């Protein structure tokens, strides 16, 4: 939640928090950098969660993974038309892409991934060129992007992969129709390519928890 780290920092030893759970590795780093997490001495966690999904000093652990993938209209976008995240910047997709706001942590994560892969100059150009392809002003959540594709507002978007499952098996028949309109594309899957961007949800024990045991 926005501002939670600052609140915990301000509360200090008086904080009532015991466990901190959050949806992005960037947020976990924020809590760690602010010294808000306590080391966890758990053989069960250490044996079951690999080193790359936890902090070096075991203050936080990844608990689930998700991929940021491309979702396309399954009839208007043919298989193979888009295979890499970089291709979203191609001018041929002008007016075809929908997006939730770039300020959201999910999109900041994918931007960081592209920045790490391409470098600052190329990543900035990619972002600007992709924005130029937007069909409308960024708005809504990931579900809203699938709905927009279903309703013909655009043909391409980025979503977390699990949202497709939520829609496909929704109790709401209208949401199931949205899912039926689209196809997921896991980008950058060719041999030697870096694969889709994967982020984590994770958590740790609050530094001043009274219930660490």
Sequence positions of predicted segments:
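Flexible hinge/capping segments at coil-to-helix
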Residues: 77-93
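Hydrophobic residues within well-ordered alpha-helices
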Residues: 8, 31, 149-150, 205
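Alpha-to-beta junction loops
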Residues: 11-20, 36, 93-95, 151-159
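Early extracytoplasmic/lumenal segment of secretory-pathway proteins
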Residues: 1-27
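A bilobed periplasmic-binding-protein/Venus flytrap-type ligand-binding module shared by bacterial periplasmic
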Residues: 69-76, 116, 188-189, 198-211
């Amino acid at each position: 939640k926005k501002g939670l780290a600052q609140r915990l920092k301000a509360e200090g030893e008086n904080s009532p928090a015991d466990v901190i759970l959050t949806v992005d590795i960037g947020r976990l780093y924020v809590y760690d950098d602010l010294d808000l997490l306590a080391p966890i001495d758990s053989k069960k966690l250490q044996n079951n969660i690999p080193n790359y999904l936890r902090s070096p000093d075991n203050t936080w652990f990844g608990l689930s993974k998700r991929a940021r993938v491309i979702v396309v209209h399954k009839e208007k976008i043919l298989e193979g038309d888009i295979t890499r995240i970089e291709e979203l910047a191609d001018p041929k997709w002008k007016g075809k892409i929908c997006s939730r706001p770039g300020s959201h942590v999910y999109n900041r994560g994918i931007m960081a991934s592209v920045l790490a892969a391409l470098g600052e100059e190329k990543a900035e150009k990619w972002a600007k060129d992709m924005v130029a392809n937007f069909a409308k002003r960024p708005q809504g959540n990931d579900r809203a992007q699938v709905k927009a594709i279903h309703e013909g507002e655009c043909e391409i978007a980025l979503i977390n992969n699990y949202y497709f499952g939520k829609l496909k098996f929704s109790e709401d028949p209208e949401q199931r129709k949205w899912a039926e309109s689209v196809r997921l594309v896991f980008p950058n899957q060719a041999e030697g390519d870096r694969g889709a961007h994967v982020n984590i949800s994770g958590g740790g024990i609050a530094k001043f928890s009274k219930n660490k045991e």
